[in-house]
């Protein structure tokens, strides 16, 4: 039974919009300003301001479900293809980034040490993933339970405004004085996808057991 969920790299809680209060959520977020927004939006959740990568290592088997959404910018095929390749001969091209390999560190840690259910979510990368994952709803997933396909509407990330993204993600940031709201909203998992994955975790057994 899924009662306690760790929400790593929680941001403002896009993945948990439709979870309700049937699970106890511990949100781990490094950025104090973002964590304060999360706490205001989801007052019944426990919010921990900490390095999610280290917190996971130290609290690995304290939850029924671990959800991790590590930073995706260094892996993003959109950033690479539209920001770098398409502007290769332009001054406006984005700078190269080392892929943040903490993503794969966490997958390996969870695969070999986690005794409960877990899922890692990220953007579909511009390279062949170093560990094979499953593409569902415009994301790539690694988990120890089956995640079934789900149909979603267009995510609206490329041209979405703050207003349209707030409506799409089910999160209103209008009363918060924080910067880069558009990027924060773009980083949010779609609410119906977050609920779908939680339901898959509840209803599907750990693979191989």
Regions found by a protein language model. Give the residues of each.
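Conserved active-site and SAM-binding loop architecture
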Residues: 1-209
């Amino acid at each position: 039974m899924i009662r306690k969920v760790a929400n790593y790299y929680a941001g403002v809680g896009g993945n948990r919009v439709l979870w309700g209060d049937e699970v106890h959520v511990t949100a781990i977020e490094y950025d104090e300003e973002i964590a304060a927004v999360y706490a205001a939006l989801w007052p019944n959740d426990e919010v921990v301001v900490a390095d999610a990568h280290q917190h996971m290592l130290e609290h690995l088997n304290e939850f029924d479900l671990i959800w991790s959404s590590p930073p995706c910018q260094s892996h993003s095929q959109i950033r690479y293809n539209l920001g770098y390749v398409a502007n290769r001969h332009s001054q406006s091209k984005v700078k190269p980034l080392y892929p943040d390999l903490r993503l794969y560190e966490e997958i390996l840690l969870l695969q070999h040490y986690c005794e409960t259910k877990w899922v890692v979510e990220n953007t579909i990368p511009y390279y062949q993933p170093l560990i094979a994952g499953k593409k569902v709803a415009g994301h790539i997933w690694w988990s120890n339970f089956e995640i079934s396909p789900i149909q979603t509407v267009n995510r609206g990330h490329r041209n979405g405004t703050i207003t349209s993204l707030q409506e799409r993600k089910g999160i209103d940031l209008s009363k918060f004085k924080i910067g880069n709201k558009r990027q924060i909203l773009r980083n949010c998992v779609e609410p119906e996808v977050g609920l779908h994955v939680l339901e898959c975790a509840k209803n599907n057994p750990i693979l191989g057991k």
